[in-house]
Amino acid sequence: METVLYIAVFGALGCLSRYYLSGWVYELFGRAFPYGTFAVNIVGAFCIGLIMEFSLRSALVSPQLRIGLTIGFLGGLTTFSTFSYETFRLLEDGELLIASANVLFSVMTCLVFTWLGIIVAKAL
């Protein structure tokens, strides 16, 4: 139950952070490009690398806190952070083909499903 509470609290904070950070970035740079989303994805990718690497090497971060920060906060902030971390680990392990497939399939599948969602929404 403690882990679920960590996820819920940090998830709410991640969602609010995404809202405010992306909004601030959009105010600075406009909406011609998805700068806000791009910014939170970069922040999330950096944070998951930092949190995972630090927490797996140190006893200072409990497993519950690590889960709260990664699944909760970063999950609320962005899902791209997990994608980045997993792809980096594949590359680090010498799995270039799998890492490349992960990038290609993830991006293409998300684009296709975005397109499908738009089609369904337009049909309603």
Curated annotation (Swiss-Prot):
Q: Where are the transmembrane segments?
A: 4-24, 32-52, 67-87, 101-121
Q: Where in the cell is it found?
A: Cell inner membrane
- On the tree of life, the source organism's domain of life is Bacteria
- Provide one Gene Ontology biological process annotation: cellular detoxification of fluoride
Show which residues constitute the signal peptide: none
Q: How is its activity regulated?
A: Na(+) is not transported, but it plays an essential structural role and its presence is essential for fluoride channel function.
Q: List UniProt keywords, sorted A-Z.
A: Cell inner membrane, Cell membrane, Ion channel, Ion transport, Membrane, Metal-binding, Sodium, Transmembrane, Transmembrane helix, Transport
**Bilayer topology:** Multi-pass membrane protein
Cystine links in this protein are none
InterPro entries (alphabetical): FluC
Q: Which GO terms describe its cellular component?
A: plasma membrane
Tell me which NCBIfam families the record gives.
Answer: crcB
Protein name (database record): Fluoride-specific ion channel FluC
Q: Which organism is it from?
A: Geotalea uraniireducens (strain Rf4)
Taxonomic classification: Bacteria, Pseudomonadati, Thermodesulfobacteriota, Desulfuromonadia, Geobacterales
